């Protein structure tokens, strides 16, 4: 959304599908009796450690990037901007639940207390947008994530610049 000429201070986009959290990287240790040559130091070591991001995380991060490009026209916040990220994570209503429970879920009376944890939902979205929507997710100074049920599972994301106020906090 643009307000006041070409000044964009907020973007919104929706990632369709079930919310996905950031998976923990798996550490793989490889052994070679002949050794591995370290590219930086030139030293030869018998073991090499490699961190591998789970495939599901890589696929979801790529989906987030594609959706952002498509819905936000490649907008990027200034490198010095302080950002506020709001996430609404809508989980699918389980088919196995009773009609009464499903109605309560749809009305927001019952909310998800299941995985993925909201911090991992935030992390996968924030990391996906590094160097695309902003320089780095360290620019996010305020964040809120809320979990709901819906017949239409999705993740809604709003990112906006934080207004600088003169009063001190803390």
Give names to the regions the model predicted.
Residues 2-170:
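Acidic, proline/glycine-enriched N-terminal capping motif
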